[in-house]
């Protein structure tokens, strides 16, 4: 009985994680993405979403979204010749300046320095 209950809980957690990740994947590039939008899309309250995300993902919603944006930004910096403004827009930041500041916090270098390093093969 206990194992069955645990298995059902794990299925629900995995279902939540899948739906959450799918929604973020589809919408991370929107600079106006909000927790309320995600909660509505997943048919739960904002509070429930925060709790489930923390339990299931071991991180906050904002942190998860920013990590996704940074991962995609790194990919674009390595694989494209897009400008910083274009990359910022594609990964969900309203300005290149804000994107640059957040990128530097996450990586320790500016997006331009990151791109130059990658082009040199370092």
Task: Kindly label every feature range from the protein language model.
Residues 12, 46, 69, 97, ...:
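Arginine residue identity/basic-tract feature
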Residues 7, 101-122:
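…primarily DNA-binding HTH/wHTH and HhH modules…
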Residues 1-43, 52-55:
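Membrane-proximal linker segments that couple transmembrane helices to downstream signaling/catalytic modules
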């Amino acid at each position: 009985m206990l194992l069955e209950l645990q298995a059902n809980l794990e299925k629900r957690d995995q279902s939540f994680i899948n739906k959450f990740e799918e929604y973020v994947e589809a919408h991370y590039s929107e600079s106006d993405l909000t927790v309320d939008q995600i909660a509505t899309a997943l048919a739960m309250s904002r509070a429930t979403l925060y709790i489930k995300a923390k339990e299931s993902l071991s991180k906050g919603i904002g942190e998860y979204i920013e990590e996704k944006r940074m991962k995609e930004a790194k990919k674009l910096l390595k694989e494209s010749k897009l400008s910083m403004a274009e990359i910022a827009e594609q990964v969900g930041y309203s300005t290149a300046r804000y994107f640059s500041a957040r990128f530097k916090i996450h990586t320790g270098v500016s997006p331009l320095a990151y791109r130059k390093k990658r082009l040199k093969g370092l």
